[in-house]
């Protein structure tokens, strides 16, 4: 199987190996440490706006997790891609799929948080029409 984005499942449904892989991805990409329970209990419903990037060995190399935050808004809970897959269009593919899915279900807004020092992510979101609405001092 080639590298591709696949529909994701709720973290509650993932096996321990997948949880460990996701924890390592979060650590590598954000510096944040999560417990198995904190990953498993993230509010991620099963819908076609949630994706995982699987490599040719069926290993998780990225994820875009979003939840239906309100009747009009989708909130990005996590968006992380392994460094070996960054800058190759994988993030854009996932983003476009999630946006199309959200619009198709009537959502009008997307909300997310990003670290102020994550220039790569900020540029990624700005290139897709996102703008900074508020800065949360001391959040990270």
Give each language-model segment a name.
Residues 82-96, 105, 109, 116-123, ...:
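Conserved glycine-rich acetyl-CoA-binding loop
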């Amino acid at each position: 199987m080639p590298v591709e984005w696949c529909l994701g499942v709720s973290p509650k449904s993932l096996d321990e190996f997948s949880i460990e892989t996701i924890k390592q991805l979060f650590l590598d990409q954000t510096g944040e440490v999560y417990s198995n329970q904190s990953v498993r209990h993230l509010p991620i419903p099963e819908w076609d706006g949630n994706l995982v990037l699987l490599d040719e060995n069926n290993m998780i190399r990225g994820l875009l997790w979003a939840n239906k935050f309100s009747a009009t808004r989708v909130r990005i809970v996590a968006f992380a891609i392994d460094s070996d897959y960054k800058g190759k269009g994988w993030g854009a593919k996932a983003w476009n799929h999630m946006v199309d899915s959200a619009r198709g279900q009537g959502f009008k807004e997307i909300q997310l948080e990003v670290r102020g020092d994550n220039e790569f992510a900020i540029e990624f979101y700005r290139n897709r029409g996102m703008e900074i609405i508020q800065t949360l001092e001391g959040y990270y």
